[in-house]
């Protein structure tokens, strides 16, 4: 189980990226392509519409991996809290950066507002997990861990497939045959139980 001492230092962009990646099961490219227009913190929804891709050695915004990867997710409370704090820090950073800031509306940009290269996310996560004694973690491990945690919490396979935007299994295909833009809500409650504040007993 990922505990308090395993997170990177509080009040850093990496912390928010890890929380969202782990609780929502996003692909690294989907995570880095998120724009604030894709996030509705008032109602707790996140829309996955794009992905960061590499074209001739450069990163740019592109399509998601598959049509089923374009999805709408209910944000667990831990992710909502992390994103609210992250947005406030980003606003402060934008003011400090001044005219050097390039406003593309990205949730997890570079220090000047541009697209973050996935290799930089991978390097930062590797440093954080090594420091926490967790060994070598690739950003995809957040996605895999989300699936494992939800499975252990008893979430049905079909709902996990919806959350992850899978399209390669028969079960996932049968779900998307009937609804092309699902709002995945069932996975949020188990993630809140796993990562939310302790419940009174």
What would you call each of these model-derived segments?
Residues 18-20, 31, 48, 75, ...:
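Conserved hydrophobic/aromatic pocket- or pore-lining residues that grip, position, or stack substrates
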Residues 12, 19, 23-30, 119-120, ...:
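C-terminal catalytic core of tyrosine-transesterase DNA break-rejoin enzymes
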Residues 82-85, 92, 118:
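Helix-coil-helix junctions within alpha-helical repeat/solenoid scaffolds
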Residues 3, 84-88, 122-130:
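Amphipathic, well-packed alpha-helical segments that form the structural scaffold of globular domains
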Residues 8, 43, 52-79, 89-96, ...:
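C-terminal secondary-structure termini that scaffold catalytic or DNA-interacting sites
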Residues 1-34, 41-42, 53, 68-69, ...:
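Basic, Lys/Arg- and aromatic-enriched nucleic-acid-binding interface segment
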Residues 43-48, 138, 149-150, 161-179, ...:
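Short functional hotspots where side chains directly engage DNA or cofactors
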